Swiss-Prot record:
Pfam families: Intron_maturas2, MatK_N. InterPro entries: Domain_X (IPR024937), Maturase_MatK (IPR002866), Maturase_MatK_N (IPR024942). The keyword Zinc-finger does not apply. This is Maturase K. GO terms for molecular function: RNA binding. The keyword Mitochondrion does not apply. GO terms for cellular component: chloroplast. It is found in: Plastid, Chloroplast. Its main location: plastid. Usually encoded in the trnK tRNA gene intron. Probably assists in splicing its own and other chloroplast group II introns. Belongs to the intron maturase 2 family. MatK subfamily. The gene is matK. Keywords: Chloroplast, mRNA processing, Plastid, RNA-binding, tRNA processing.
Amino acid sequence: MEEFQVYLELDRXRQHDFLYPLIFREYIYALAYDHGLNSSILVQNXGYDNKSSLLIVKRLITRMYQQNHLIISANNSNKNPFWGYNKNLYSQIMSEGLAVSVEIPFSLQLISSLEKAEIIKSYNLRSIHSIFPFFEEKFPYLNYVSDVQIPYPIHLEILIQTLRYWVKDASSFHLLRLFLYEYCNWNSLITPKKRISTFSNSKSNPXFFSKSNPXFFLFLYNFXVCEYXSIFLFLRTKSSYLXLXSFGVLFERIYFYAKIKHFVKVFDKDFPSTLWFFKDPFIHYVXYQGKSILASXNTPFLMKKWKYFLIHLWQXXXXXXXXXXXXXXXXXXXXXXXFLGYFSNVQXNPSVVRSQMLEKSFIMENLMKKLDTIIPIIPLXRSLAKAKXCNVLGHPISKPVWADSSDFDIIDRFLQICRDLSXYYNGSSKKKSLYRIKYILRLSCIKTLARKHKSTVRFFLKRLGSELLEEFFTEEEDLFSLIFSRASSTLQKLDRGRIWYLDIFYFHQ
């Protein structure tokens, strides 16, 4: 990155339309393809080495300099001479270049904000570790939780208009709009088969992206979520807790921060609705992937108001059609909230904590809520069935995709899945469901080996013996755990206790 810093500083000197020249710079595509222009898509095209890849980029830049080739006919865009026979390759290269150039102002803004706040740069900002202290410390004291599915905008034009409020570069966004329309005509980026989140199993998210160009569209999607979250948090902090104060939602982003300084009742012309809700100092907001969690200690009446407020905010500000089922409010003690990509559920159960002030005094029992991790067998089995490790009924089957690998690699891949599950669900008190999943993986591994060697499952069971069985069901005892030791004989039964999420801290380091 240091070798390109000089070029970036020169291009940043033009504050007006400073992004547009970056699209014609070779080093932008070098940054996109890991400094070598030989990764991602270019690797899949046989016969292209580093030099020829650089020639492809130069040829693409030369075509972009010829402005007449960038004009697309409104009647028939398929005859556009700009792309030629290599339209898929050129479009993929250009999408990576656009992704890098658009991300530059936001990355520079993040670095400057970290420097002003004297915060050390962290590469683990998207870590899941911050979720677990939230559930451990805050979640048991809340009454209601709302599991929210963040909808996706109806059209990509909405994302471009949102970006224009942050970056004043008309030329770049005209080219970006032209590029997206060309992509939509080919149907090569947006396909009805791949979702934006591979872990999401909700059918309410209409956003689908192809595997070949995820970086650019994931940036647009994450920016839309960030924009929605910023408006939501701003309205939450500025709402009134006294009486039923009403105000208009600041849907448009033009002069948004000027309106923050002089906060008054502002009504949008297209959406003159008035929202009524309270400022809740006890509400907690956690966003992960395409979903978010709203947890509060308020009454169900206020939670319903927040629910309809979110739906109205999506429909008016983000121009997304969100159904009422997208935000479901439930009592935290009665229902579990599924979160993250590991299909983990948590439930708040009552627990008795015994305490003793003096050695021979009475033992006091305090009732408090504790968090139990549940291993959901049905979602995990569905995930394994999607990965072709078992059928829909949970019966193990062979995985033919891995049959071409060596025996060591096949066994190691299945064992790695078991280690991941053990590390994640190690704190669960009931591990019967985990053992069932491991049993499915073990038989799937053996059937894959038998398929590779054209033999029977019984033969491989005799050949491998009990060693493979022990490896699949061995607990990860070497993982770090926090143990509380007490010398008092009265509390002998409470000597050991595991804080389960610390195991994941160690596993992901």
